[in-house]
C-alpha cells in the first residue's frame, strides 16, 4: 500500500517466536523501530503529493529520480519499512523447517542443497560489518544469489527480488543475545517461514 504507509500487523503474538526470539525484542523491534521508519517515511513524502500513490518498492528502485532533499530519508526509512514488512512475514512460530517446491529445486541446483545455502547465508550475515541485512535474492534472469546490504538498503535497489531476508542490526537480537550474533543466526533458522519464501520466489 502506498502513502500514508502503515505499520503492518505481525500476524502472530510477540511471544510466538520464543525461545528463539524473545517477546520484548519483537515488541520493541516492531512498534518502535519499524514504527519509526513508517513515521519518518510518511513525513518525508508529505510535501510531495505526486509521490503519494507510489509503492515503496518503486520509490527505492528510482531513488535518483526523487527530489534530492528526500532521497536519503526514503532510502533509510523506505528501506526500513520494506525490509521489516518482508521480515515479519518470513518469520513463523515453529518455522517451516526446509524449503519446498520450486524454491527447493532452485536451491538444490544452484547451491547444492539446503545445508550449503544455510552456510552461505549465515556467512553473509556474519560478514556484514555493523548494521545491515543478509539476503537470498532472485535476479531478473531467474537465478538465486546470496548477498548482504548495509543499513536498511533493500536488494530491489540493485534490481534483485528478495526471497529471504535476515536482519543483523543489533536491535534485532541484542536484548537476548547481546553481542552473540552467531547464536542469533543459529536460532533464527528455527523460525524462518519457507512457505512464504516459496511464495516470494514464485512471484519474482
From Swiss-Prot:
Q: Which cofactor does it need?
A: Mn(2+)
Its Enzyme Commission number(s) read 1.15.1.1
Question: Which note does the record give on the cofactor?
Answer: Binds 1 Mn(2+) ion per subunit.
Top-rank EC class of the record's enzyme: oxidoreductase
Q: Which SUPFAM superfamilies match?
A: Fe,Mn superoxide dismutase (SOD), C-terminal domain (SSF54719), Fe,Mn superoxide dismutase (SOD), N-terminal domain (SSF46609)
Q: Which Pfam families match?
A: Sod_Fe_C (PF02777), Sod_Fe_N (PF00081)
Family (UniProt):
Belongs to the iron/manganese superoxide dismutase family.
Role according to the record: Destroys superoxide anion radicals which are normally produced within the cells and which are toxic to biological systems.
Q: What is this protein called?
A: Superoxide dismutase [Mn]
Name the source organism.
Answer: Thermus thermophilus (strain ATCC 27634 / DSM 579 / HB8)
